């Protein structure tokens, strides 16, 4: 038994460090790449080639969702629409085409596994971490598009990952920072949250990612990532999934707060997880500590060695499958939706449409919330598309000064994300509205207030579509 075989750490840098190369030669199961590992397509391919040269069975993964969450385009903003826009467009062929384009780019970069799609049903509009990463609020629609996304990306030889099992959509907390609880009963969970996972499994999804959430109706004692009833019971025995169960990053507080990553790794394996994503920055000493904790747990009987061996074999099987097809040509990639189609999915109030029809200068104002850990600090919306804001306001800014940046006679265009979740943003919007004509744009998941235009995404492509609607 080699504990390294089930570990998938992250690191910082554009080239493979010597210590990580040695871990790969020693049998490390995979490497998870993040924005800190991506400088250019050529550099990324050289990095993945180096990883595979050190261990041909290593699974190279990346968080590329084709929208707000993008590692390939973290520096410039994503050219893809994102799941919420695709759900509103509700054309499964368009969703499959976007996923195929994502898959083709990942295959060219030497990536084996994309940690996508997000198949959560966004049941709570206050959700701080899912939102526009979801295909929507209707389980049947989310299921259709989840299956299409899986089919599209896997047709290019890149494995997909349906996440976050058994459903992270009905939470008002971010599991990067806390341990959320989904209080729904079992009947609701089966009717609302599970259909997209079932559809993904039917589409042949290679992997499923766990969520660091409590679901008392399924397991009152442990988070899903550590839960035998949820992973071995519901996912394996109940739904019949035989692929690789991947954990969400174990450095997230929802998994490791109060126990540490090594203990979280042991619990995840015991629960039924196979490939353990450790996080974005895992130094050699930490990898060693996790491997030692797994070995010690097997030695003292608190972790079944057969369970670790089973997990390692599932990871190796995934690695072998990719090693055999890495040189295969990708399938043809169809055209994907453009700005015009994206613009058609926007919600635009009658008042905003009338204001935008007037021939007058625009003053763009930017509301900049603290960035979501999953999304990262990526360029977004019209600002990724080249718009210069007359003023930018964050949580500690002065709303009056923000409003004063609008020139006389201009139409104020206030652009933010999830405006309804931020009292400081609502105060700023009120201040700008108080000085004159204003159009408020929400590029996140809109609430029932403070949005004249709702775009349901903030990728660079969605920003281009917004520019076409509003003009300069």
Question: PLM features: residue spans?
Answer:
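Catalytic domains of carbohydrate-active enzymes, especially glycoside hydrolases
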Residues: 22-34, 101, 108-113
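A substrate-binding/cap region within the structured catalytic cores of diverse enzymes
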Residues: 89-111, 118-134, 146, 150
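Acidic (Asp/Glu)-rich catalytic clusters
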Residues: 21-27, 48-55, 155, 201-202, ...
